[in-house]
Amino acid sequence: DPFFFFLAGALLTGIISATRGFGDAGNIELNTGALRIRDGAGVTTASILPDANAGNAGDIRINAQELELQGLAGIASTTFSGGDSGDIDINATVVTLSDGGVVTADSIQSLTPNGLAGDIRIYANQVTLDNRSRISTTSSSGDGGNIFLEDIGALILRRGDGIGGIFTDGGVFGEIGDGGRIFITADFIFAVPQESTDISAGAFLGTGGGIFITADYIQGIEFRDGLTPLSEITAFSQLGDSGVVDVQVNALDPTQGLEALPEEPQRPQIIEGCVADGNQQA
């Protein structure tokens, strides 16, 4: 979505490291108990010289107990040049993105050779994306980057409205470029089908990327061949070949380890929930 490309480059209030020449931008590392960024502010590295030989954007590394991005705030490493976007590494207990918050490592240009989109790695007990919030590593005219969400306790995806979710897309400005790869390991993944919050590794002319998910439970989101008004996991290409989706659900018996209760004259009614399917592939 071009809106998010613009947003990634517009985070000019906050902590910024940028290059306008042929040298690389510096890296940013933050170590703190709680980091809260709101109302359009951001932590940003960028390469903004419109030249194929421009320098690279810097990397961003954040270590925090709590990370909150609210109200079009974000963490962004972006290139508007032939330089590469930097990588983003987040290690936190709780990560919350709401009201358009973004974590993005994008390449936004049509120069040759193309600058590369960066990779995003997030390690957290809980990750929440709510109300059009987004984790993305996308290229306008090259390959999308890779996203790693590892050792996540709960991944909660809400109210995406077709914009929010987890995305690695290639060639989104109608250029050649393949989708990147998304790797997720989580205990629990929750979404609401009607809220259109997606996990997507797409492309326009190139090949769709790869999505590899291992979880104990997945609720409210499932594989589909392309983007729909519902919440989905997809690796489609508009004009090229689709990519690969591999979802492994290690569902456990929720009654395992429970002791039987003594019979009573009146038992409460028990409604058993549905357990997600074992595998979904495309």
Over which residues does each language-model region extend?
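Extracellular and secretory-pathway beta-repeat/beta-biased strand scaffolds
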Residues: 1-282
